[in-house]
From Swiss-Prot:
InterPro entries according to UniProt: NEP1-R1 (IPR019168)
Function: May form with the serine/threonine protein phosphatase l(1)G0269 an active complex dephosphorylating and activating lipin-like phosphatases. Lipins are phosphatidate phosphatases that catalyze the conversion of phosphatidic acid to diacylglycerol and control the metabolism of fatty acids at different levels.
One cellular component (GO) term of this entry: nuclear membrane
GO biological process: lipid metabolic process; positive regulation of triglyceride biosynthetic process
Subcellular location: Nucleus membrane; Cytoplasm
Pfam families for this protein: Tmemb_18A
Name under which the protein is recorded: Nuclear envelope phosphatase-regulatory subunit 1 homolog
GO molecular function, one term: protein phosphatase regulator activity
Membrane-spanning segments: 33-53, 68-88
Keywords assigned by UniProt, alphabetized: Cytoplasm, Lipid metabolism, Membrane, Nucleus, Transmembrane, Transmembrane helix
Membrane topology: Multi-pass membrane protein
Length: 131
């Protein structure tokens, strides 16, 4: 392998490990925040859904009025829906997304990478067409 190609690979590997490692602290913070928020919102949704379904007025009044009568259920459910529509769960797995997409691209060049961004050079496949 040429020295310039080797230097390019090393520079690419340094940059990839830098990008992956820079996501780790924010990913950890998002995981903690998401765990707290999702548990709180899930508990609120579950408990308020129980009261909402047990309310005798639920079967009589229109849905919008029923949701207006039970604001905790409405807000908790809307919060969960909005969080997932915005893709909050992707912030938790950002480094894995980056490394998996990089592996797909590197596969064309007979390479791969580990979860930290270190390059893995695969041995070349030999073409034995001799009979």
């Amino acid at each position: 392998m040429e020295p310039s190609a080797c230097e390019d690979l090393k520079a690419f590997e340094r940059r990839l490990t830098e990008v992956v490692s820079s996501y780790r602290p924010s990913t950890f913070r998002w995981r903690k925040l998401l765990a707290v928020v999702l548990s709180a919102m899930s508990m609120c949704t579950a408990i308020s859904a129980w009261y909402w379904l047990r309310d005798p007025r639920t079967t009589v009044v229109p849905l919008t009025e029923s949701l207006w009568i039970h604001p905790v259920f409405t807000v908790a459910t809307l919060t969960l829906v909005v969080l997932f529509i915005l893709g909050i769960q992707k912030l938790v797995i950002a480094p894995q997304i980056i490394t998996s997409r990089t592996r797909m691209v590197l596969g064309d060049f007979n390479m791969s990478c580990d979860d930290t961004g270190k390059l893995i050079l695969k041995p070349r496949q030999s073409n034995n067409n001799s009979t």
